[in-house]
């Protein structure tokens, strides 16, 4: 039965009431009804919408609970870049004066000109986000990403009750609100207590808990975490209609507040640097009592017309600066130095500290990065050391307090073998990191080795992802890549959330992977510094795996693009007998390959096209990206022109990206490049 006019009217009334209660509770911190009454209204609306689906609208409060997981995070290009703000390195009042001097010089203001008006705000320790409203409706939320391209996280952001799904009044037809998603300290403590009770992951700090929730594919995770939001600016704005466009940063925050969007009350309009210094000192004194984490304050030229005159330098506005506080320090004992083996085989010294309260948390461990850092800082086990929470997040040891030594201290000695698997530990001449050489054998590296081996660009075992690898390794079913080829249907099907069909599909993918190319197999081994392009050159040069395994460093360096560093990596990998044993197990399991190099694609989406690479790609080196394009028939050029077909842009892309935008050249990120190359010929 369809909904009656009374049903439509009641649903609209319930939505208005719930939205008003949400705003009072989550934004104003002034609840207007008891929880039981709110729950009753919510259940009534939910029941109405379930009974009559035609009543459901995108901005209904019932949509905040989170729906089915999305298949993936889609890239979003920011119409107005979300650029970072320069950090003033001088944490004293001198940093404020330096900023004011730069602004006055850029505006060509003489010594007798009136002081510049600024707005002082807090610098939140959270996740930057952009909220896009069209005709008053929230249509998209995106992360900052690299400033130019972020990720669509609308599904998660909808669950944050502080963020309105619909703006009241008559806002511009299009408005992007920029701000920060964060988690209050008390909410973070409750979350971690709940996680600990249920055996879940305990988070290091509120920022990690907030950012991790927003970027989940399943919005229900964000809905279960107590996330908050503060707005601090605009992005793209369309026709204003009857809305009064703000002329200053302060007016903008007031306008956002009038739209029901949360803004922080701790802000000040200051004339000249003196008011900013007073604001900096006042917030520093109140910092520990704030209900959320901050790592500094932000100063902005208040007038928008002056902001436009000042403009930008590279990726930063001239009209704003972040002024961080000095990291907090304490002294404690360096009880011991232990070695952790990471997923990539890095042996990392970790300081075990006598518990000390610093920067708002109790610190018991600190990373020492590598042996050279320990020597550079002159640390001895048993030292009294200065511990700092750098950036208020990562604990680090600054230095020993030498005058407190009593003679019982002892030096740290880096182990010569991996403490996990016993393989030889080695350090390249130009590297500071010591690494385990048992890449295919070491338990600490198992999961990473299996994921790399099964990757699409390696042995291409479809269906073998992170969660399944966790189950296989944690359950003791798989230890090395060779064990994959011993899996049976019954053992796989008995795993949690693994149906017979999924198990059969995985076994089929494993079976298919038995036949590869030599280049793919070499890449799949996960030899450090050996990417796809180098693997192809090695396969082309040696023609067989045995010849490669027996090659010495001198012969390895005869291969194109293989220098001393790569040659030592390859030789060290094959010198470890554990790795050779796994390779022989793979051969015995029927893994084989064509001793040749794949032909360059003669026809396809990249064939005959000219590409230009700029910036740092997330997972590929520039050489790997170049080789991948060329293997599909494309050509890579060093400069952008009208003849350029595509520009592949990563983080920190520079003038080439700007030139491409000017010429209207198609721009791809790494995922876009892969999708293009995967298109059928």
From Swiss-Prot:
Pfam families xrefs: BRCT, DNA_ligase_aden, DNA_ligase_OB, DNA_ligase_ZBD, HHH_2, HHH_5, Nlig-Ia
Active site as annotated: 123 (n6-amp-lysine intermediate)
Cofactor: Mg(2+); Mn(2+)
Gene Ontology BP annotations: DNA repair; DNA replication
Stretches assigned to the BRCT domain: 601-681
UniProt-annotated binding residues for Zn(2+): 418, 421, 436, 442
GO MF term set: DNA binding; DNA ligase (NAD+) activity; metal ion binding
InterPro entries: BRCT_dom, BRCT_dom_sf, DisA/LigA_HHH, DNA_ligase, DNA_ligase_AS, DNA_ligase_CS, DNAligase_adenylation, DNAligase_N
Physiological role: DNA ligase that catalyzes the formation of phosphodiester linkages between 5'-phosphoryl and 3'-hydroxyl groups in double-stranded DNA using NAD as a coenzyme and as the energy source for the reaction. It is essential for DNA replication and repair of damaged DNA.
Protein name: DNA ligase
Gene: ligA
């Amino acid at each position: 039965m369809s909904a009656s006019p009374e049903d439509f009217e009641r649903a609209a009334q319930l939505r208005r009431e719930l939205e008003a209660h949400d705003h009072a509770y989550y934004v104003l911190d002034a609840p207007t009804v008891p929880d039981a009454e709110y729950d009753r209204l919510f259940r009534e609306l939910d029941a109405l919408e379930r009974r009559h689906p035609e009543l459901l609208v995108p901005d209904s409060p019932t949509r905040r609970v989170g729906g089915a997981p999305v298949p993936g995070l889609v890239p979003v290009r920011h119409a107005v870049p979300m650029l970072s703000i320069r950090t003033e390195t001088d944490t004293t009042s001198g940093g404020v004066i330096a900023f004011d001097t730069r602004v006055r010089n850029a505006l060509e203001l003489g010594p007798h000109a009136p002081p510049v008006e600024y707005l002082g705000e807090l610098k939140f320790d959270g996740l930057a986000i952009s909220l896009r409203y069209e005709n008053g409706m929230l249509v998209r939320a995106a992360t900052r990403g690299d400033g130019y391209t972020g990720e669509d996280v609308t599904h998660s952001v909808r669950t944050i009750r502080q963020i309105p799904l619909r703006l009241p009044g008559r806002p511009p037809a299009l408005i992007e609100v920029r701000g920060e998603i964060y988690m209050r300290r008390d909410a973070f403590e409750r979350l971690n207590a709940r996680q600990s009770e249920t055996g879940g992951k305990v988070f290091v700090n509120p920022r990690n808990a907030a950012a991790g929730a927003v970027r989940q594919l399943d919005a229900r995770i964000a809905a279960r975490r107590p996330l908050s939001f503060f707005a601090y600016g605009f992005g793209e704005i369309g026709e204003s209609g009857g809305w009064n466009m703000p002329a200053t940063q302060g007016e903008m925050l007031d306008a956002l507040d009038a739209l029901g969007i949360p803004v922080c009350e701790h802000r000040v309009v200051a004339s000249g640097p003196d008011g900013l210094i007073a604001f900096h000192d006042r917030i520093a004194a109140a910092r520990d009592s704030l209900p959320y984490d901050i790592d500094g304050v932000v100063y902005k030229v208040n007038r928008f017309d002056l902001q436009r005159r000042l403009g930008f330098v590279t990726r930063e506005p001239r009209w704003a600066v972040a002024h961080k506080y000095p990291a907090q320090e304490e002294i404690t004992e360096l009880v011991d130095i232990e070695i952790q083996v990471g997923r990539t085989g890095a042996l990392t010294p970790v300081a075990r500290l006598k518990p000390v309260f610093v920067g708002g948390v109790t610190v018991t461990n600190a990373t020492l990065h590598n042996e050279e850092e320990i020597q550079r800082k002159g640390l001895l086990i048993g030292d009294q050391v200065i511990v700092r929470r750098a950036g208020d997040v990562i604990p680090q040891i600054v230095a020993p307090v030498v005058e407190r030594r009593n003679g019982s201290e002892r030096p740290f000695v880096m182990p010569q073998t991996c403490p996990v698997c016993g393989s030889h530990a080695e350090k390249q001449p130009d590297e500071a990191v010591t690494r385990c050489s048992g890449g295919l054998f070491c338990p600490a590296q198992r999961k990473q080795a299996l994921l790399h081996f099964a990757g699409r660009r390696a042995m291409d075992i479809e269906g073998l992802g992170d969660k399944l690898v966790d189950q296989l390794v944690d359950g003791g079913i798989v230890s090395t890549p060779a064990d994959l080829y011993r899996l049976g249907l019954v053992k796989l099907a008995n795993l949690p959330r693994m149906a017979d069909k999924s198990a059969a599909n995985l076994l089929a993918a494993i079976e298919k992977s038995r036949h590869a190319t030599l280049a793919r197999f070499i890449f799949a081994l996960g030899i450090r510094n050996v990417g796809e392009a180098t693997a192809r050159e090695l396969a082309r040069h040696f023609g067989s795996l045995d010849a490669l395994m027996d090659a010495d460093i001198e012969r390895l360096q005869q291969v194109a693009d293989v220098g001393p560093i790569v040659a030592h990596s390859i030789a060290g990998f094959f010198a470890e007998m554990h790795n050779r044993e796994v390779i022989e197990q793979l051969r015995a399991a029927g893994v084989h390959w064509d001793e040749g190099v794949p032909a360059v694609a003669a026809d396809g989406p990249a064939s005959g096209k000219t590409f230009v690479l700029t910036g740092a790609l997330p997972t590929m080196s520039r050489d790997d990206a170049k080789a991948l394009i060329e293997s599909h028939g494309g050509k890579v050029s060093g400069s952008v022109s009208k003849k350029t077909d595509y520009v592949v842009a990563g983080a920190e892309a520079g003038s080439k990206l700007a030139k491409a935008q000017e010429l209207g050249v198609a721009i791809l990120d790494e995922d876009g490049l892969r999708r293009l190359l995967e298109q059928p010929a």
